[in-house]
């Protein structure tokens, strides 16, 4: 089981794009949260966190690289649970 955190500028459809990337990598989202805050420049920033079970072994770097390709993603953090 993995915990994935994605920090990005907020926009419509962001959670759907993140979910699609995870599904394409054979991941099942167990739980997730998405919060929107403002940064120091008053930009809306989304903080998406999900606990994921991958059906097949998945390299953290591959998952991170695919998530970073999403428009306006600033940071991806992956940790084991």
Locations of regions flagged by a protein language model:
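A conserved regulatory-domain signal marking ACT and ACT-like small-molecule sensing domains
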Residues: 1-81
């Amino acid at each position: 089981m993995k915990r994935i955190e994605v920090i990005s500028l907020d926009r419509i459809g962001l959670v759907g794009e993140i979910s699609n990337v995870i599904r394409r990598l054979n991941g099942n989202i167990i739980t997730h949260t998405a919060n929107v805050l403002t940064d120091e420049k008053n930009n809306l920033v989304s903080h998406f966190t999900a606990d994921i079970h991958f059906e097949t072994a998945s390299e953290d770097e591959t998952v991170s690289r695919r998530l970073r390709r999403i428009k306006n993603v600033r940071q991806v953090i992956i940790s084991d649970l």
